[in-house]
Amino acid sequence: MDFNDTKEEAAFRAEVKAWLAAHAPKHAIAPGQVLSDADQVARGKAWQREKYDGGYAGITLPKTLGGRGGTIIEAVVFDEEEGRYHLPKGPYIGIGLGMALPVIGKHGTPQQIEKFVEATLKGELTWCQLFSEPSAGSDLAAVRTRAVKDGDDWVVNGQKVWSSWAHHSDWGILVVRTDPGVVKHKGLTFFVVDMKSPGIDVRPIRQISGASDFNETFLTDVRIPETDMIGGVGEGWACCMTVLTGERLSQGEKGKIASLMAYAADTPASTGTQLDDASVKLALATAYAEEQAQNYLQARLRTMV
């Protein structure tokens, strides 16, 4: 693929560079700085609001939905330039922009679009993905979490796992089984769920690093109003495909290894800095190569759409 900018793309890149130079530094995280979860979320929301005010939130989202109405290549350009700064961009923001908004925009009602889209673009709402289960990961259609209709609500029981940042999310996108008597792909229904709903128990999973980015999420008699169903009954698989397309296109994170290299270069060691250590250099070089491969794959996927 051709990585050279067209005349129009070069002009957009120059515009983005100038805007980022004026607005990104005050939001940037210093190399080696460790933030609490609460600070990460607060700063991530503030940076998202800055982008919204500047017209860079939801670059590919149609203007009718409050986005910029730009091209996928413009989104790639912005990501590349934004990646030059160490900014607070966690999954609690990315899931909303890259997964929740596409499915709500494509399958949601006008009322759902009005309720969720602008607030998410502004960084006022954070999101998690409630898909994977202990016995349904790669085989997503095998989910067992059940939803049964009761009046104007659906009552949900089940368990989800590996829910990134669910413990700090306002809303979740949820796929459940509503009809166990049909082919598994056809018995699914899609909801958005308020993570503060009674019956939701989010349990952080402690990682070896000490952080807790992932969670187990238990749903016990959780009542979800039918107005929070996305699409119709049995249309959950189509909604999932919309979400997963957005997820695949959002893979790759620019600038993380460069930031780590800068930190290593500034961190003293027994002789020189950490970056002078051959084993550190090798580890960073390996990580950089993997990051670049992932970024090139992302660019290829985006330009194939």
Question: What are the roles of these predicted feature ranges?
Answer:
Residues I93, S135-S138, W162-W165, P180-V182, ...:
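Short Gly/Pro-enriched turn/cap motifs at secondary-structure boundaries
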